[in-house]
Amino acid sequence: MPRLFGTDGVRGLANGTLTADLALGLAQAAAAVLTRGRSAEARRAVGKRPLAIVARDPRVSGEFLSAAVAAGLASSGIDVYDAGVIPTPAAAFLIADFDADFGVMVSASHNPAPDNGIKIFARGGTKLPDVVEDRIEEHLHLEKLTPTGAEVGRIQCFADAEDRYVLHLLASLPHRLDGIHVVLDCAHGAAAGISPEVFTDAGARVTVIGDAPDGMNINDGVGSTHLDRLAEAVLAAGADVGIAHDGDADRCLAIDASGRTVDGDQIMAILALGMKERGKLRDDTLVATVMSNLGLKLAMREAGVRVVETAVGDRYVLEEMNGHGYSLGGEQSGHVIMSDFATTGDGILTGLHLLSEMARQRKTLAELAQAMTVYPQVMVNVRGVDHHSVHSDELLRSAVEAVEAALGDSGRVLLRPSGTEPLVRVMVEAADQETAVRMANELADVVRERLAG
């Protein structure tokens, strides 16, 4: 039976694979697993029940799914603070700020509106390790907690959830944004009610698109996966910069004044150099994934910043950061984690600090983005192959080594087998697009030949 939890919680078609029954069951299982710690026991010792935060993005299905989650928790003896529609990083912050035992976010992030998901955070607002998710999944089929009478949980509105998060974001800023004109694309998502307020309070002149969520238009032609509209809006408004969020606002991508995209790698480069200059980049180290652009690594090396690589996924970036106390990490996709202020990727926080660097250095985004050269990166997906043998086939390994030798210090090769299907991703970076395309296709042919299913 396939694992229920994916790389970012449980996701599926709302009311299809992800039903109210499953949401309720997951909440009950989470309650059984996550209330065994000292914090929950200390609450019980003084006559209090364990506490959880529940929140959601504005998808129409989020209403019944979050209600099912809250019901599952309360029926297990957990007091629930319902924060309503807020960004995922806001929920993570509130779990820590309110000293809750854990929390649940109902969102499918950048996925289309018919999908939804359930993401569970541990005490402190951190993502759950795989082993804890496995225990929750096992508990779906075990006996649930069944308190009665005064021992059942209460559900109440978390009335000042947004205000707490907004004040936290503003307090994190090292420099105000006065004089900067920004276009915000809120993806018709969870950022629509918060991001414009925060950027305005920080001093920026704000134009907003994608700020009218109706439950079904989340990520629909807007947000961090659809940057064309934001680029057009930046040019039309004559703005200095554009900031794009995704549906739950845990990502940030940017557009410069000329309409060019500034991706997560470039944002990390800008923030890392600024933090190093201000003495805030712990151990002069940046955590990135194996998919981050070669240009990021070269630029950081030249600036005296060490880059530590992890597997793809912000959870692995965060594990590395937490394990060694690093202060900055992220992904090319725009998940950027600033651990001094957040326990997960925070698109609003990232955008604020990016604009803060523009204001502090009195430079345009295009000027700051010159901190790194973006190498052409070509990805070819090879399907229907034995992906388990990708690192053991000798002739394939020789072909990879030959391409690496030809590229030298001006490129790199990465073969990534899928964890869920017979697919191998062939990625090549080179100094020019033509070389990257040619070598990626050549290697893809070798993969097909050697690993044919």
From Swiss-Prot:
Pfam families (alphabetical): PGM_PMM_I, PGM_PMM_II, PGM_PMM_III, PGM_PMM_IV
Record SUPFAM superfamilies: Phosphoglucomutase, C-terminal domain (SSF55957), Phosphoglucomutase, first 3 domains (SSF53738)
Keywords per UniProt: Isomerase, Magnesium, Metal-binding, Phosphoprotein
Enzyme nomenclature, EC number: 5.4.2.10
GO function terms (MF aspect): magnesium ion binding; phosphoglucosamine mutase activity; phosphomannomutase activity
Assigned GO CC terms: cytosol
PTM text: Activated by phosphorylation.
Residues with PTM Phosphoserine: 109
Residue positions of the active site: 109 (phosphoserine intermediate)
GO BP: carbohydrate metabolic process; peptidoglycan biosynthetic process; UDP-N-acetylglucosamine biosynthetic process
Family to which the UniProt record says this protein belongs: Belongs to the phosphohexose mutase family.
Designated name of the protein: Phosphoglucosamine mutase
